[in-house]
Curated annotation (Swiss-Prot):
The lineage of its organism: Eukaryota, Metazoa, Chordata, Craniata, Vertebrata. GO terms for cellular component: apicolateral plasma membrane; external side of plasma membrane; extracellular space; plasma membrane; serine-type endopeptidase complex; vacuolar membrane. The chain crosses the membrane at residues 518-541. Glycans are attached at residues 113, 243, 256, 408, 494. This is Thrombomodulin. GO terms for molecular function: calcium ion binding; transmembrane signaling receptor activity. It is found in: Membrane. Residues 542-577 are cytoplasmic. Disulfide bonds join 135-156, 244-255, 251-264, 266-279, 287-295, 291-307, 309-322, 328-339, 335-348, 350-361, 368-377, 373-387, 389-403, 407-416, 412-424, 426-438, 444-454, 449-463, 465-479. Residues 240-280, 283-323, 324-362, 364-404, 403-439, 440-480 form the EGF-like domain. Residues 477-492 have a biased composition (Basic and acidic residues). It comes from Mus musculus. Endothelial cell receptor that plays a critical role in regulating several physiological processes including hemostasis, coagulation, fibrinolysis, inflammation, and angiogenesis. Acts as a cofactor for thrombin activation of protein C/PROC on the surface of vascular endothelial cells leading to initiation of the activated protein C anticoagulant pathway. Also accelerates the activation of the plasma carboxypeptidase B2/CPB2, which catalyzes removal of C-terminal basic amino acids from its substrates including kinins or anaphylatoxins leading to fibrinolysis inhibition.
Amino acid sequence: MLGIFFLGVLAPASLGLSALAKLQPTGSQCVEHECFALFQGPATFLDASQACQRLQGHLMTVRSSVAADVISLLLSQSSMDLGPWIGLQLPQGCDDPVHLGPLRGFQWVTGDNHTSYSRWARPNDQTAPLCGPLCVTVSTATEAAPGEPAWEEKPCETETQGFLCEFYFTASCRPLTVNTRDPEAAHISSTYNTPFGVSGADFQTLPVGSSAAVEPLGLELVCRAPPGTSEGHWAWEATGAWNCSVENGGCEYLCNRSTNEPRCLCPRDMDLQADGRSCARPVVQSCNELCEHFCVSNAEVPGSYSCMCETGYQLAADGHRCEDVDDCKQGPNPCPQLCVNTKGGFECFCYDGYELVDGECVELLDPCFGSNCEFQCQPVSPTDYRCICAPGFAPKPDEPHKCEMFCNETSCPADCDPNSPTVCECPEGFILDEGSVCTDIDECSQGECFTSECRNFPGSYECICGPDTALAGQISKDCDPIPVREDTKEEEGSGEPPVSPTPGSPTGPPSARPVHSGVLIGISIASLSLVVALLALLCHLRKKQGAARAELEYKCASSAKEVVLQHVRTDRTLQKF
């Protein structure tokens, strides 16, 4: 029975269950972090299982000989064989003592069948199988092991005289210690209550969550444990120490009873914590961690320091914090007109009609004063303006102080000289029509975009380049086609060699390509230059021809008498040599 703590026969405690109001715990055992309790009274397997669950536990699992020894101790305290339920059941199917392992096909209420122990009252060689639903009780009145608890299969609807519950806890506390040298100790007694409803005074260990009532001091203590620890300690809701005779007043180090109220003391190198009972070493802080802004250490006195604050702050009464100084309330006023305090400083403002210039409030001037707007200046703020234009005009994008004609319609009135009504101007992209009306030029109808999509707007147009251009899908007036190299074309066909065209055979005309307007202008200029050059050459040749003819006539007239004409035969004759 290693690791078993005998808790003795405990006083009855109500389960708080209407269906099992008569069932009361009669004993309890704790092994490490598990506690087991025996409840006496008639109950079916379902009633027993629900009763354990209401107490935050479940029917007992007997996985080792240690758990079997706990059952023996609990049953030995009863004068009759209760045959209590344990947490082993066969919901459906039949058992098999030979092929289904030590549990014969049964499983624990926790949903598994892991075990290193089994003790069946029915021998394994019994041939007739038992079929579920079946549940298991333990009894000491069996033929297989008289006096030793053995497992018996029974229908789950059977009412037994008790059941065993199992509870798991992460930590536990020792019973309260009382200082026997204290004269008051002889009159002090403690009564404990466990979370699963068992109460009494004779315990070896108590699970976390148990409570202790100490009389006649009127103390109510609770077993608690920090998260992640297995060793609990007794505590109460109030801070500070309780009576030093019980559990050292809850103090971690010393309990001082020399004063009217008990007080906990800590070693010199440790500080008392907020609960008034535990001790901890102080956290060493650097000088800068002690002051809100700046800390200056005193080299002459080790451990001493002084705190300082930034500009606009002053040191608080505690000597560590820094408080903001309201500069606006300091005399004289640091601002010429309005002052607004800020954290660590202030801001100056001026009344309406004034602006802050170099720390002074000066009266605002008309923002249009000195402006160079061509038509009219319009203030937009006390310090800014914008230029506006007459109807039919708009500010130039690159020179907003100047105006240019603007028309957002297909036709608008022209800007004519009042002294010369025939002298009129139109916005760019418009043409003067009917003397005083500017009409939009439809560049799209003039083929400005060639084969690309064209969109006309008042005074302008845009081209959307086609898919066969380098800027396909983009808006541009330079939608040049993608150049195609003839030597990179691949011949496609049936695999026969290509046939070269014979001389004189007609060939298809070359595909028409759109020509850019700049190219057309260049061609026109070159053609005109060529015509002018040809005309000049023709004039030169005619002049030269006239001079030569005059010279020839003169020569013919002066040598007419000296010329002897000789008859020349035109027929061919053979000459012999």
